[in-house]
């Protein structure tokens, strides 16, 4: 990929697991990155591999024509833009904000409409893939925009995603992401339940995973999450269980708004809540396997 020639750095707010992966890919592609995070530790870590660090979010906004947001949810974005940090007050007309976070689609649409009269474009570019997948450049970007309007930022998305799908309107990328996350989560849950049953029957779990991977039962989550489940190796997390619970709750709320039934996802949410209540929310989401430990009284 050719190096960037833009005079301004790309702004990046949020330097957690996903934000750091995005930053590394942008730097590798030759872009300049100016970032900020409320966590000083996260800022130091990103500065260590070449990210410029702003004094605050407003400095990043003032110096960037295109900004990426990698935040926890819609509330975090609204606090950043309209709350005490008041990023909006530092943005110039013509600035494009690309939100890679997973939040409520309706919130994104509302914020898009709120910002548009001031000449600020807010676009959702939800990423399908863990921080490791993003770091490898293998994520999928689900964009709430038209491809014809992506001229100012499409090359940036290409730095950390192997494919970009344009869904046409603000919020639609997030809707597609929630559908994708539903399948991801239930694939993990199905694998955990199958291995839990096999364990209870004293079957060889390594052999069972090989069998599941060899036929039509295969899913890609088996490649990484399966071995993690067998080893009970959930740290350091690639994607946190608590983060996925947040996504599952978004799916359930969206489904409720649509009048759609998601009974298996409802069950998944209850199992995740049990694990979070037991103190496992910061483990990798492969720790859904521990739900079957809890129900058998295992440690």
Residue ranges: model-predicted function:
Residues 1-70, 100, 131, 165-166:
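NAD(P)+-binding Rossmann beta1-loop-alpha1 motif at the extreme N-terminus of oxidoreductases
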Residues 10, 102-182:
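Rossmann-fold dinucleotide-binding core
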Residues 57-69, 73-122:
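Rossmann-fold NAD(P) dinucleotide-binding segment
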Residues 136-144, 165, 169-201, 210-224, ...:
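Active-site-proximal catalytic alpha-helix in oxidoreductases
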Residues 206-214, 265-270:
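Beta-strand segments within the central parallel beta-sheet cores of soluble alpha/beta enzyme folds
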Residues 218-280, 285:
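Interdomain hinge/lid region at the active-site interface
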Residues 278-299:
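NAD(P)-dependent dehydrogenase/reductase Rossmann-like domain
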């Amino acid at each position: 990929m050719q190096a960037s020639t833009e005079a301004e750095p790309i702004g990046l707010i949020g330097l957690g697991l996903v934000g750091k992966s995005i930053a590394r890919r942008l730097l590798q592609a030759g872009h300049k990155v100016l970032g900020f995070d409320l966590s000083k530790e996260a800022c130091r870590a990103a500065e260590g591999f070449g990210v410029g660090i702003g004094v605050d979010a407003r400095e990043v906004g003032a110096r960037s024509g295109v900004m990426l947001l990698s935040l926890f949810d819609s509330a975090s974005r609204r606090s950043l833009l309209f709350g005490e940090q008041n990023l909006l007050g530092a943005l110039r007309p013509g600035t494009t904000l690309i939100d890679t976070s997973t939040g409520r689609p309706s919130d994104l649409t509302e914020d898009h409409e709120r910002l548009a009269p001031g000449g600020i474009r807010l676009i959702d570019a939800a990423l399908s893939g863990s921080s490791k997948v993003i770091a490898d450049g293998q994520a999928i970007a689900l964009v709430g925009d038209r491809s014809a309007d992506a001229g100012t930022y499409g090359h940036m998305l290409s730095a950390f995603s192997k494919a970009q799908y344009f869904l046409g309107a603000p919020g639609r990328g997030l809707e597609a992401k929630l559908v994708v996350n539903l399948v991801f989560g239930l694939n993990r849950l199905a694998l955990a339940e199958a291995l839990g049953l096999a364990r209870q029957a004293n079957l060889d779990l390594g052999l069972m995973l090989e069998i599941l991977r060899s036929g039509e039962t295969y899913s890609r989550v088996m490649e990484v999450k399966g071995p993690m489940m067998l080893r009970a190796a959930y740290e350091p997390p690639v994607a946190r269980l608590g983060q996925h619970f947040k996504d599952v709750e978004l799916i359930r709320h969206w489904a409720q708004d649509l009048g759609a039934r998601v009974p298996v996802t409802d069950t998944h949410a209850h199992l995740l809540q049990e694990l979070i209540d037991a103190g496992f929310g910061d483990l990798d989401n492969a720790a859904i396997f521990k739900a079957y430990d809890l129900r058998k009284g295992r440690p």
